[in-house]
Amino acid sequence: MFRLTPQAEADIEEIALRIAADQPAAALRWWEGALEKCRRIGEMPRIGVARPEVRPELRTLPFGNYLIVYREIEGGAEIVTVTHGASRWQDLLRP
């Protein structure tokens, strides 16, 4: 089981819309792939890399050029944000 935070929902939508501006079919594939990766994370929440240097509970898993940031919760995972791998996402999530 996985759930998306409002931020993660907005991130996925924004990325898909950006891709769709030039390549609608690619955007649909990306969106479907992102949700499938989130499902896998929900089934195996320890699959990603632990990120204690940012926050003790956070993990990350790459998806293409993007990084899915999540935390393990009872019964699965909560997707916190989806960001480009080259971004300084750590700075946004530090307490």
Give the predicted meaning of each segment:
Residues 42-43:
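Short proline/glycine- and basic residue-enriched helix-capping loop/turn segments at helix->loop/beta transitions
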Residues 46-75:
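Basic/aromatic recognition patch in beta-strand/loop cores that engages polyanionic ligands
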Residues 66, 71-95:
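Enriched for short, Lys/Arg-rich terminal
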